A protein has these predicted regions:
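Residue-level recognition of strand-loop junctions within catalytic nucleotide-signaling folds
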Residues: 56, 92-97
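Regulatory sensory/coupling modules that transmit signals to nucleotide-handling catalytic cores
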Residues: 1-11, 108, 112
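A near-ubiquitous, low-amplitude feature marking generic local secondary-structure context
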Residues: 4-7, 13, 17-20, 72, ...
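Generic signature of intrinsically disordered, low-complexity segments enriched in small/polar residues
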Residues: 6, 33-34, 51, 92, ...
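Catalytic core regions of nucleotide second-messenger enzymes
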Residues: 82-85, 113-117
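Conserved long alpha-helical elements within nucleotide-processing catalytic cores of c-di-GMP signaling
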Residues: 16-75, 82-86, 100-104, 108
């Protein structure tokens, strides 16, 4: 009997990098992104912001998934949204010279999502 292990390797690789419940970047992959962003900032003098969000203990699993989805949808493709703890999320916002005000807009949207849950 012959097994195709390529699909299993892709599944295992994906599980290692993403949170199983929310499908957001997990803590270890977030810290890899953060290290790269710090190195890039040193090279080209770019900036970034980190937003840490801790949800209340009474948050249901469904509300948690809704929050994660809304959080992911409120950010840009170049930003990194991560679940690093049971009720803890972190967003890495990359700030460019051409669009510095975008980070403030994203922070406002994240605040609205947080207050809505």
């Amino acid at each position: 009997m012959i097994f195709d292990t390529t699909n299993l390797e892709n599944i295992n690789s994906n599980n290692i990098q993403f949170d199983e419940a929310t499908n957001l970047v997990n803590a270890s992959l977030f810290y890899e992104h953060l290290e790269r962003q710090i190195a890039q900032s040193r090279r080209d003098n770019s900036q970034f912001r980190i937003i840490r969000i801790i949800l209340p203990d009474l948050m249901s699993e469904l509300s948690l998934l809704d929050f994660a989805s809304a959080l992911n949808q409120s950010t840009r493709n170049e930003d990194v949204v991560s679940r690093i703890g049971r009720l803890e999320f972190v967003v890495l916002l990359r700030i460019s010279q051409s669009t510095p005000d975008k980070s403030k807009d994203i922070i406002g949207r994240i605040s609205d999502i947080y207050e809505g849950h």
